[in-house]
């Protein structure tokens, strides 16, 4: 699919409802919304006197946001499409995708075209443009491992810039765009470097167990096998946002130093943990939440999912305030019981 042709026409949608634009399904209204299908429309927005002075929010799949109030500004609905191989060499393909492309569909497309690497990240909700902001990751792989570069528009000027990995400053579920660049840029396209020599990432027991259940030995697994296994695992563990509103994993897995981990393990020997290369230890946030008795519990119309404690859900009619109150209650209990601070992944507005 080619990248879209230039079209700087901009249509503003006043008093636009946002429930269909966030995976929690939370009701909120934007003063204006604009559907963005080409980068040139950002420059048009910058020149438009109706909205140039207003706060702006770029929204892709809405899988990483919790609206706690109406948005008194313009929501930019990123619908920039397109997927293509921009070049290849002896070692890799360089694949570009528009910021508004569905992430899971893009991963599936790369595999269908014989380009492996992203399969561990299958079925993560959201868009391609949101992936670098969060440095999405799952089952032993972070997006940054295959990231090459991206093009972003600075909202204040309408000018495009290219960012390499160093400039993006990726961290664990983190990047420049969540820190210094937060709210300043819209990601137009992302380019990935997918090596022609595929190396499977099978360090997570869930994946190898699923492969085994399918009669596939890990050393014989193809990229498609891993993709199918990850999809099956996620569908079994995580609710479909179209059925039960949610934003996937609500909390980051906390990373603590060795001394804090030793103290924690002395109190809770069964704590689920993952040693990190730098000597720190990553904890399973879902395990901490479950041990505090939150799995399946609710506050108002917001609840903790009954199969995955890391997921908060909208049981119907929940407000952003309901979700935020539930998240804060969980954070307080985990801090009290384990001395560990949980950080929310979604942005609360």
UniProtKB/Swiss-Prot annotation:
Family annotation (Gene3D superfamilies): 3.30.465.10, UDP-N-acetylenolpyruvoylglucosamine reductase, C-terminal domain, Uridine Diphospho-n-acetylenolpyruvylglucosamine Reductase, domain 2
Main location: cytoplasm
GO CC annotation terms, alphabetical: cytosol
Signal peptide start and end residues: none
EC number: 1.3.1.98
Pfam families (alphabetical): FAD_binding_4 (PF01565), MurB_C (PF02873)
Active site: 173, 249 (proton donor), 345
Pathway: Cell wall biogenesis; peptidoglycan biosynthesis
Keyword annotations of the record: Cell cycle, Cell division, Cell shape, Cell wall biogenesis/degradation, Cytoplasm, FAD, Flavoprotein, NADP, Oxidoreductase, Peptidoglycan synthesis
SUPFAM superfamilies, alphabetized: FAD-binding/transporter-associated domain-like (SSF56176), Uridine diphospho-N-Acetylenolpyruvylglucosamine reductase, MurB, C-terminal domain (SSF56194)
Cofactor: FAD
Cell compartments where the protein resides: Cytoplasm
Matches recorded under InterPro entries: FAD-bd_PCMH, FAD-bd_PCMH-like_sf, FAD-bd_PCMH_sub1, FAD-bd_PCMH_sub2, MurB, MurB_C, MurB_C_sf, Oxid_FAD_bind_N
Catalytic activity as recorded in UniProt: UDP-N-acetyl-alpha-D-muramate + NADP(+) = UDP-N-acetyl-3-O-(1-carboxyvinyl)-alpha-D-glucosamine + NADPH + H(+)
GO molecular function: FAD binding; UDP-N-acetylmuramate dehydrogenase activity
Keyword Transmembrane helix belongs to the record: no
HAMAP family linked: MurB
Primary role: Cell wall formation.
Annotated family: Belongs to the MurB family.
NCBIfam families found in the cross-reference section: murB, PRK00046.1, PRK13903.1
Name by which UniProt lists this protein: UDP-N-acetylenolpyruvoylglucosamine reductase
Organism: Burkholderia lata (strain ATCC 17760 / DSM 23089 / LMG 22485 / NCIMB 9086 / R18194 / 383)
This protein's encoding gene: murB
